Regions:
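Class A (rhodopsin-like) GPCR signature focused on the TM5-ICL3 interface and adjacent 7TM helical core
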Residues: 103-115, 148-154, 181-216, 254-276, ...
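Extracellular TM2-ECL1-early TM3 structural module of rhodopsin-like
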Residues: 9-21, 47-107, 114-124
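Hydrophobic residues within alpha-helical transmembrane segments
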Residues: 22-25, 54-57, 61, 68, ...
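Helix-to-loop junction signature of class
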Residues: 20, 61-77, 90, 97-104, ...
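Loop architecture of class A 7-transmembrane GPCRs
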Residues: 1-6, 74, 78-94, 127-130, ...
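First transmembrane helix
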Residues: 12-39
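Intrinsically disordered regulatory tails of 7TM GPCRs
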Residues: 1-7, 157, 209-252, 315-358
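Seventh transmembrane helix
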Residues: 261-264, 270-273, 293-344
Length: 358
């Protein structure tokens, strides 16, 4: 059966397309700055920054190779780029989405190992190997969407969708592949990241209580007793603990914001993708078009979300942006080389009784 025409006025479609073009611009510029900062500053090429740059690169590719065609299709309510590119666009969309999710998953596991397990083993070399492996895995998972699948887009005789999507199918193989995509893109990463962040939160809470209790014990000692003790020769001063709790709280809050952003942006799209393949009634209904636009908007919003969060929450990123933006007119600005310094993030979360935490 043929799909119903989308009940969205032309003015609204053009407005949505214009906003999407604005999202493309912001997403491209913000993520490009992230990549260039890491590329041009040797001191910024730590393992975590290499991962963030890869995440930014996948968002750039999503902004350039997928979002413009979606904006045109939303404005014209017609897919004008041919059936061949329709299939290719599906593959590219899932490739860059899977790569971005893979990087988020690697970062989450790395934070878990550092803070909870006290194992800081992710070197820049290992990060590069993980990045290469994630690209290969993402390509292998997304490649089957190019062949043997019924696709749909606005004006192609199937469902009215704002971009090429995996359409309704009775095939068990097609449905199984859709479930695989949903599991790989959302459900497994969500479960792993949720577990990691809950463990991180529990660890930070325990360390906070330890610091609070330790400080209270020493603050309750009578002043006279402290004076008499200090007069004794060879007696060490009471250990002092200085922990930047505001930094710890802010760092974890930043991680939590990224996780919440991932969940909000991808849960609706995952549900819509599953319904489109399993429910013929939903796929060919008039509500599929506006619902698809909303889900796609949220998924594309992720390309804008990450650099905004970096600039808002990370002081070093803001400082690097301030250094870089005035030089952006130069093609190859010379940056003085800096010695590389291995940063141990686990030190931030270690309660030491002999030295202050970094």
């Amino acid at each position: 059966s043929e799909a119903a025409t989308p009940l969205i006025p032309v003015t609204l479609r053009v407005t949505l397309a214009a906003i999407m073009i604005f999202m493309i611009t912001i997403g491209f510029l913000g993520n490009a700055i992230v990549c260039l900062i890491v590329y041009q500053k040797p001191a910024m090429r730590s393992a975590i920054n290499l991962l963030l740059a890869t995440l930014a690169f996948s968002d750039i590719m999503l902004s350039l190779l997928c979002m413009p065609f979606t904006a045109v299709t939303v404005a014209t309510a017609d897919w004008s780029f041919g059936s061949g590119f329709c299939r290719a666009s599906i593959m590219l969309y899932w490739l860059f989405v899977l790569e971005g999710v893979s990087i988020l998953l690697i970062i989450s596991v790395d934070r878990f190992l550092i803070i909870v397990q006290r194992q800081d083993k992710l070197t820049p070399h290992r990060a590069k190997l993980l990045i290469a492996g994630s690209w290969v895995l993402s390509l292998c998972v997304s490649l089957p969407s190019v062949v043997g699948w019924r696709t749909g887009a606005a004006g192609m005789g199937a469902a009215w969708a704002p971009q090429c999507v995996l359409g309704y199918s009775d095939s068990l193989a097609d449905r199984g592949y859709t479930v695989l995509l949903a599991v790989a893109v959302f459900f497994v990463p969500f479960a792993v990241m949720l577990y990691s962040y809950m463990c991180i939160l529990n660890t930070v809470r325990r360390n906070t209580l330890r610091i609070h209790n330790h400080t209270s014990e020493h603050s309750c000692l009578p002043a006279l007793n402290q004076v008499s003790k200090m007069r004794l020769t060879g007696l060490q001063r009471p250990p002092q603990i200085k922990v930047d709790m505001s930094f710890k709280t802010r760092a974890f809050t930043t991680i939590l914001i990224l996780f919440v952003g991932f969940s909000v942006c991808w849960l609706p799209h995952t549900v819509v993708s599953l319904l489109a393949v399993f429910s013929r009634r939903f796929y060919y209904s008039s509500v599929f078009y506006p619902v698809s636009i909303g889900a796609l908007w949220l998924s594309y919003l992720k390309t804008v979300f990450n650099p905004v969060i970096y600039c808002w929450r990370i002081r070093k990123f803001r400082e690097a942006c301030q250094e870089f933006i005035p030089k952006s007119c130069r093609l190859c600005p010379r940056v003085p080389g800096r010695s590389r310094r291995r940063v141990r993030p686990s030190n931030i979360y270690v309660c030491s009784e002999t030295q202050s935490a970094v």
